[in-house]
Amino acid sequence: MPRMQTPRITIWNEYIHERESAAVAAIYPRGLHRTLADALGRQPGLTVRTATLDEPDQGLPPAVLDATDVLVWWGHAAHEAVKDELAARVQERVIAGMGLVVLHSGHESKIFKRLMGTSCHLCWREAGERERVWVINPGHPIAAGLGDCIELEHSEMYGEPFGIPTPDELIFISWFEGGEVFRGGCTWTRGSGRIFYFSPGHETYPIYHHPDIQRVITNGVLWARPQGRPAQVPRHVPVEQARQPIVARGASVHDQAGKLASRHA
């Protein structure tokens, strides 16, 4: 995955609710992926494209993934419709250095669960209650430009316990009007790839139109972009290429090229 001076962002959205629910379509008439693309497009130095589940190869053929430095993922109604092969390809790209920003209900996506290795389950309630997203790591780049918290008048409650591995960094904790709290902004590294999960974003509320939410996602994309050189694939180093002269000793089940010798030889 080549590194570019201009980060290439792909926003993937299953794009189902906007076409099946009048309430969601009224908020995101062109799809929430277009709202996010418009917001990211205002950030100088980003190249932004969108992809949806109904496109060929579910929107992410190998050529698109190869041309993506950070993938933004939103899914809810069609987690199981995402092909296992696609989830595996995304996982491979992340481990090789592609950044991943997972939003809201994407915590149940195949790709997020693969990378976390845990259930990723949580508690939830859809009641349009107030959410206060507290910035608990104000010095982190993802929190740049924010105040003490983000106030959302209407939101879906996500609550603990949240079945994720301990985050490398915890940036936001949400409080909800009903009393619950939630680790709503977390980061991890998998291989050479950076991952940011951000919980606000229920589809029936205009959360992705909120300037501070857009700022967090933009900051998250900038933070998650590839760092340095990509991870190298495993490779065999022949004896004659050792940095210091050595002599091979003992038996081996590999041939001189490093491949397993035939079991039937």
Q: For each predicted feature, which ranges?
A:
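Short hydrophobic segments within beta-strands
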Residues: W12-E14, L103, F198
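Extracellular ligand-binding/catalytic regions of CAZymes and related secreted enzymes
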Residues: P2-T6, E126, R190-A265
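Cell-envelope and extracellular/periplasmic
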Residues: E14-Y15, W74-H76, G201, R225
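Catalytic beta-strand/loop cores that center a nucleophilic Ser/Cys/Thr
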Residues: L46-R49, L122-S199, P234, A248-V253, ...
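A glycine-rich, often tryptophan-bearing local segment used as a flexible ligand/cofactor-contacting loop or short
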Residues: A78-L146
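Short glycine-rich His-centered loop
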Residues: Q5-I27
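Helical hinge/lid and interdomain linker segments adjacent to catalytic or ligand-binding clefts
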Residues: A25-S109
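Short, solvent-exposed loop/turn elements at domain surfaces
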Residues: H17-S21, E180, P206-I207
